[in-house]
């Protein structure tokens, strides 16, 4: 009978992820623009990895559709407004992680981003909105996994 040798497999240490959850309310301004910081910047040195980003959102008032974008914001830059009239929806477009349209009549919205992002200290992720109805209010819950690398 042949001998079978059991191979030893080496597995490195896995990163320990922390699941963060936040909730809040945001409102659009008189022009219909609004937004919030979903993953806040930190002063801790080192790189953070953010993945499995999920946002649940419901509109508190009746109105029309909503344009949204989930945007990576590097340190030293500011969040721009959405351009829904013509051209690219968000500039610079290489920072857009996910985008779409929210139909109010369809019920609550759930945004899931399959993109994981490495964040340096000072970097953040923001949710940018544009509503055709000004002064609209939204409730949201954000959930994501983060680790320090």
Give the location of each predicted region.
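Tight coil/turn sites that cap or link beta-strands
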Residues: 31-34, 122-124
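N-terminal leader/pro-regions and domain N-caps
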Residues: 1-33
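Extended, solvent-exposed segments with strong compositional bias
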Residues: 17, 77-119, 138
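Beta-rich globular "head" domains
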Residues: 33-74, 143
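Short low-polarity hydrophobic stretches
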Residues: 1, 53-55, 125
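C-terminal interaction-tip segments
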Residues: 11-16, 118-149
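Extended hydrophobic/Leu-rich segments
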Residues: 26, 55, 73, 79-84, ...
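Short, solvent-exposed secondary-structure capping/transition elements
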Residues: 61-66, 79-80, 137-139
């Amino acid at each position: 009978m042949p001998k079978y040798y059991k191979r030893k497999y080496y597995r490195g240490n896995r990163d320990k992820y922390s699941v963060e959850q936040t909730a809040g309310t945001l409102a659009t301004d008189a022009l219909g623009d609004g937004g919030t910081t979903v993953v806040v910047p930190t002063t801790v040195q080192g790189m953070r990895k953010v993945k499995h980003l999920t946002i649940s959102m419901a509109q508190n008032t009746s109105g029309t559709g909503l344009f949204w974008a989930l945007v990576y914001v590097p340190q030293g830059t500011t969040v721009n407004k959405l351009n829904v009239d013509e051209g690219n929806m968000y500039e610079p477009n290489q920072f857009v992680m996910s985008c779409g349209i929210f139909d109010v009549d369809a019920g609550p919205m759930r945004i899931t981003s399959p993109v994981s992002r490495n964040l340096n200290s000072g970097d953040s992720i923001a949710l940018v909105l544009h509503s055709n109805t000004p002064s609209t209010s939204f409730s949201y819950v954000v959930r994501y996994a983060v680790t320090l690398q």
